[in-house]
From Swiss-Prot:
InterPro entries: DHFR, DHFR-like_dom_sf, DHFR_CS, DHFR_dom. The keyword Zinc does not apply. Keywords: DNA replication, NADP, One-carbon metabolism, Oxidoreductase. Belongs to the dihydrofolate reductase family. The gene is Dhfr. GO terms for cellular component: mitochondrial matrix; mitochondrion. The lineage of its organism: Eukaryota, Metazoa, Ecdysozoa, Arthropoda, Hexapoda. Its EC number is 1.5.1.3. This is Dihydrofolate reductase.
Amino acid sequence: MLRFNLIVAVCENFGIGIRGDLPWRIKSELKYFSRTTKRTSDPTKQNAVVMGRKTYFGVPESKRPLPDRLNIVLSTTLQESDLPKGVLLCPNLETAMKILEEQNEVENIWIVGGSGVYEEAMASPRCHRLYITKIMQKFDCDTFFPAIPDSFREVAPDSDMPLGVQEENGIKFEYKILEKHS
């Protein structure tokens, strides 16, 4: 069974967004997101990023689709003509996973939001890990990360993951990996 990971940055009140944007500006965290979701061990493959409609359109137009990754948008209201060529439209996460299982060009699959997609993904038996950036501050948010089930446990960091508390623009944050155990 093909599995996936989630990647998210959350503040102390589990907020992840405000008015379709990120509530904070942390360049090094965005670079970490980009590097992590692009990294493959096989140079002939790429990774997929799976997101809901609001998350896709929340990415600045100049930066979407997210480069060097297969972008998959989950929506039952969009048409293929609403998205650029090369962006895959699927009605739900399981359909996207079945399509990805049929081809051999994708190495890693990353769930990148939003709230409803994260919730569905964490409940799935396909869910492997949650890469979470814990922002040690509260921000005004209107979109929140769902409660993390007890089946997730912290595991050792990846070799290229910055360790310990980081700080940028007066905002402290830390990278963690949680793995789902059955």
